[in-house]
Amino acid sequence: MIGKLTGILAERNPPQVVVDCNGVGYEVDVPMSTFYNLPGTGERVSLLTHFVVREDAQILYGFGTAEERAAFRQLIKISGVGPRTALGLLSGMSVGELSQAITTQELGRLVKIPGIGKKTAERLLLELKGKLGADIGLPAHAATDAQADILQALVALGYSDKEAALALKALPKDATVSEGIKLALKALAK
C-alpha cells in the first residue's frame, strides 16, 4: 500500500524514525543497518517501505535499499519469523552476510542474533537455501556492481551460489565484468 516515503527526517529513536511528508509524520521501524546510514535530523530522506496491517496495529517498516526490503519480505514468509524477528536479523547482519550465511549453511552465525534460536535458524537455512540471493538479486559476496554482475553471470551459467562466491573471492577487486567472468571460469574449470 505504501511503497516509499520521501520527506524530512523529523525524529530518530532507534529502531524507529519519523519521516515528515508534507506535514504528516510517518513512524517507520527500520533495521539498524538502515538507521546508521540515515542523514541527520532535518535532512531529506527516502525510504522503501513494507506496510503491515494487523488486528491491533498498522506498522511501516523502512529500508535504505531494495535488497533489504526484498530480504525482509522473504524472511517474513517463513513460519515463525515475524516482522520484528526479520528486522532483528537485518539489524544484526547485512543482507550480504545473511545471504552468505544461508548459502554456506552457517547455523552458528544465525543463532548469535538476538531472538534467533536454533530451531528458527535451522528453519531459515532450510527454507531460504537457494532463494535469498537469487530472489533479491543480491550476490552473497559482491562489494561492487561489477562483482554482482560477475556472480549473477556465473549462477546463470549453472554454477551454484557457493561455487560462484568462492570463484569471486579469488578475483581482483577491480576486475571488470568481462575480465572477472573469464578469470572465474578459468578458476572453476580447474
UniProtKB/Swiss-Prot annotation:
Source domain of life: Bacteria
Location of region: Domain II: 65-137
Gene Ontology BP annotations: DNA recombination; DNA repair
Recorded GO MF terms: ATP binding; four-way junction DNA binding; four-way junction helicase activity
Keyword terms, alphabetized: Cytoplasm, DNA damage, DNA recombination, DNA repair, DNA-binding
NCBIfam families given in the database record: ruvA
Record text on subunit structure and interactions: Homotetramer. Forms an RuvA(8)-RuvB(12)-Holliday junction (HJ) complex. HJ DNA is sandwiched between 2 RuvA tetramers; dsDNA enters through RuvA and exits via RuvB. An RuvB hexamer assembles on each DNA strand where it exits the tetramer. Each RuvB hexamer is contacted by two RuvA subunits (via domain III) on 2 adjacent RuvB subunits; this complex drives branch migration. In the full resolvosome a probable DNA-RuvA(4)-RuvB(12)-RuvC(2) complex forms which resolves the HJ.
Name assigned to this protein: Holliday junction branch migration complex subunit RuvA
Organism: Variovorax paradoxus (strain S110)
Upper taxonomic lineage: Bacteria, Pseudomonadati, Pseudomonadota, Betaproteobacteria, Burkholderiales
